[in-house]
Swiss-Prot record:
GO molecular function ontology, one term from the record: unfolded protein binding
InterPro entries according to UniProt: Chaperonin_GroES, Chaperonin_GroES_sf, Chaprnonin_Cpn10_CS, GroES-like_sf
Biological role: Together with the chaperonin GroEL, plays an essential role in assisting protein folding. The GroEL-GroES system forms a nano-cage that allows encapsulation of the non-native substrate proteins and provides a physical environment optimized to promote and accelerate protein folding. GroES binds to the apical surface of the GroEL ring, thereby capping the opening of the GroEL channel.
Gene3D superfamilies from the UniProt entry: GroES chaperonin
Name of the gene this protein is made from: groES
Keyword Transmembrane: no
Record keywords: Chaperone, Cytoplasm
Pfam hit, one: Cpn10
Subunit (UniProt): Heptamer of 7 subunits arranged in a ring. Interacts with the chaperonin GroEL.
Protein name: Co-chaperonin GroES
Record's subcellular location: Cytoplasm
Any one GO biological process: chaperone cofactor-dependent protein refolding
Organism: Caldanaerobacter subterraneus subsp. tengcongensis (strain DSM 15242 / JCM 11007 / NBRC 100824 / MB4)
Tree of life domain: Bacteria
GO cellular component, one term: cytoplasm
Amino acid sequence: MRLKPLGDRVVVKVIQSEEVTKGGVILPGTAKEKPQQGEVVAVGPGQYIDGKRVEPEVKVGDRVIFSKYAGTEVKLDGEEYLLLRESDILAIIE
């Protein structure tokens, strides 16, 4: 199944944080930080401002940092994705 975002929405595959600390302690799900990094897997066509479509700045394959509590979580085929507005993306990792 493919997701095709609309407007200025972006689909990001969440990159999970380590489950084991450097000291070897296994972290339970409740102790882990909410992920803030991911890889862009789909991008919408952009939003309209003053009647003109503005293309998104991110593209498929970009690794990005996003706001901790932004977006809508979606689980498809056992994979976790976030559906974000482009404005929820804080930076592109180069």
